Structures are given as structure tokens and as C-alpha cells.
């Protein structure tokens, strides 16, 4: 499939529909909406999930492969459902890392999160971008949930959930 994210071996829509079906089943069993946590390229189909279910309580995007375009149907669905969104980025994001190609790419992805967040908040939504070093949490790479301080990151995400997700 060739799309805005490049040539991939996955169909983001198929993945989004499968995740939405799982979320709906969880809702049917528990009566609770789900918090969708995505990572990296898994962020791309994650943005589409609200097109297929209205049971997403929040989206936590950990260094996603870009944010939803503000002119997309996925973005509109998130705005309509008032889904709180947060983005998490570890170290090695920013202009000081221009000599590292992967860091340049992730800095561009973080920039798309800033664009999304500005538009989403202006549309009445709630979105934040968390750069862990700005929070005093350092030593994290793209797989921050595997880093030695993953408990600190989990606590930070949990605090965001407690503050932003209502039951």
C-alpha cells in the first residue's frame, strides 16, 4: 500500500477497524471506554480508530509515526468525540541532533504533533505534547517502555490519564 506514510506492508484502515472491533468488544463486556496507546508506526492506524468506534476514552501516542492531518476524517472524528490526546517523545528530538538522520525524522514527527495539538486545542479539544527531557525525565530512546526508567514514564502517563480522562 502506498500512502502518505510511505510504502507499507500494512493497511492502516484494516488495522484500525480490527482495533475498533476489539475496543467495541471490551465496551460490550465491561461498559468502559478504552484508552488507546499507540507506538511508532502503530500510531498511524491508531488515528483512524475513532472513525470506527465511539468508545475511545483517550489516545496516548508514544513517538508516533506522525500525527493525524488536521484536514482528515480521523481528526474530525476525534474532535467530534472530544477525545483527549497526548504525545510522548524521549531524548534526541530537536535541532541539536541534525547530524543523526533518525533524530531528524523523529523531530519532524514531533513537529507534526505540535501542529496537531495547536489545531486540536483551537477546535476545542485537549491535546498535549510531552518531551520527557523537559519534564526532567532523561535517558529515553524510541522504545521508552523498555528503558530502565519505564516505571517513571508509566507514572507520568498514568498521571496524565487521571487528569484528562473522565469516566
Give the residues covered by each predicted segment:
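Conserved alpha/beta-hydrolase fold motif
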Residues: 36-37, 59
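The feature captures the conserved acid-bearing segment of alpha/beta-hydrolase catalytic domains
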Residues: 64-132
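Active-site signature of alpha/beta-hydrolase-fold catalytic machinery across serine-
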Residues: 48-52
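Cap/lid segment of the alpha/beta-hydrolase catalytic domain
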Residues: 1-13
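Conserved acidic catalytic loop of the alpha/beta-hydrolase fold
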Residues: 16-34, 160
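Catalytic active-site module of serine/aspartate enzymes centered on a nucleophile-bearing elbow/loop
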Residues: 123, 137-139, 143-167
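Gly/Ala-rich beta-loop-alpha elbow adjacent to hydrolase catalytic centers
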Residues: 37-46
